[in-house]
Regions:
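Phosphate- and other anionic-substrate recognition elements at nucleic-acid/protein interfaces
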Residues: 1-80
Length: 80
């Protein structure tokens, strides 16, 4: 995958009970910017909504610890 293939970039700052997620479109518009519970169903809902805008890239600041669920859900949904 090349960076040119990405339509939506999601950055997730993870926390124990909830995360903060900000998503930008390719042209830099903010398309999501709010708290995101550390909950599989809610993560899937947000990821699906953003996938409707195109190819998604998820970046998590702590992927091996409390951010593992956000990464696992993204991978399960075919998100890079």
């Amino acid at each position: 995958m090349d960076i040119e293939d990405i339509d939506v970039f999601i950055g997730i700052d993870v926390g124990k009970s909830e995360h903060w997620a900000t998503a930008l479109s390719r042209d830099g518009r903010k398309v999501f910017d709010k708290a995101l519970p550390n909950d599989e169903d809610r993560l899937r809902e947000v990821y699906q909504r953003l996938q409707a805008k195109g190819q998604v890239l998820v970046v998590v600041d702590q992927p091996a610890t409390i951010g593992a669920l956000a990464v696992a859900v993204a991978q399960d949904m075919g998100i890079t």
